[in-house]
Amino acid sequence: NNLYPICSDFERDFPSVCFALATGVGKTRLMGAFVAYLHLAKGIKNFFVLAPNLTIYNKLIEDFSNPNHPKYVFKGIGEFAQNQPRMITGDNYLQTSQMTLFHSEVNINVFNISKINAETRSGVEPRIKRLSEYLGESYFNYLSNLDDLVLLMDESHHYRADRGMQ
């Protein structure tokens, strides 16, 4: 048993894992594999993928949502061929209602920290934290109250700055 120690305690109330991998080795594909595994093995259906800038944000949306894209992260995963995950982005989440969220087996939220930070610079509360008439609460609060939300951060070293912590 000493050859393969088992982790029994985390510094937080939730497990936190970090992968420091070189450019081009497939970090986005690894995120897709995490989503597939956590859904199929553990029944988790809510994921939040955070991008540090607009370029990576657009790339993540394409890689997670377009089965015809060469870098589609769920290629070969039969369970997602018939029931593709619902893609909720920083551009379309305001049109999302709780009813539509319950109809999807897997919800993948992709947001861009730069867009959220731009709103805080003007002294205004970010839209994600404002009341949504569709949900009856802010989308931020809705996400915060999900018991099974998994946060995936691409280029996570960008988020420790003061504005990212807000």
Which residues make up each language-model segment?
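RecA-like P-loop NTPase motor core of helicase/translocase proteins
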Residues: N1-Q166
